[in-house]
Swiss-Prot record:
PANTHER family: MITOCHONDRIAL RIBOSOMAL PROTEIN S5 (PTHR48277:SF1). With S4 and S12 plays an important role in translational accuracy. Located at the back of the 30S subunit body where it stabilizes the conformation of the head with respect to the body. This is Small ribosomal subunit protein uS5. It comes from Bradyrhizobium diazoefficiens (strain JCM 10833 / BCRC 13528 / IAM 13628 / NBRC 14792 / USDA 110). The N-terminal domain interacts with the head of the 30S subunit; the C-terminal domain interacts with the body and contacts protein S4. The interaction surface between S4 and S5 is involved in control of translational fidelity. Keywords: Ribonucleoprotein, Ribosomal protein, RNA-binding, rRNA-binding.
Amino acid sequence: MAEREQRGGRDQRGGGRERKEREERDSEFVDKLVHINRVAKVVKGGKRFGFAALVVIGDQKGRAGFGHGKAREVPEAIRKATESAKRNLTRVSLREGRTLHHDIAGRHGAGRVYLRAAPAGTGIIAGGPMRAVFETLGVQDVVAKSIGSSNPYNMVRATFDALKHQDSPRSVAARRNIKVSTLQSRRIGGDAEAAAD
């Protein structure tokens, strides 16, 4: 008993409350394995094979991130990629909690993506790696198109590049020193004029 008191009241399992908090924090995230690739390192005795994993995680409430991990075994590569993604989270503002505020484009290397806001009920119209990003982010309605490189790494990075360039009405209003209601009334007035033409 004296030994247990010296260690701060923790038993042999350790962790206690800290471990429980960490597990709760981890359980709020949804993770998707986007791509797994076999890689080789050439050493003096020949080739040493391993695996590289690309993982996207998010809380489905506007936070998402991606990570890359390499290891000799697949589960370890996925674990490393997930840890990397948790350190690399990005917050994205969503309109009505379901779609983007406006159309945006992003690029990385030879990969380009175009993302369009969509009305309710459209669903996620996107392929492969982009779909995983939107599902973990919590986007329910979006139309996405990729042009150029279909490399999953480039597509995920290009998608996050596009999402970083999105502006919410609140941030635009703050930049222009006007109220959000003024900005939205101008937008509605502009839409009515365009429809009349």
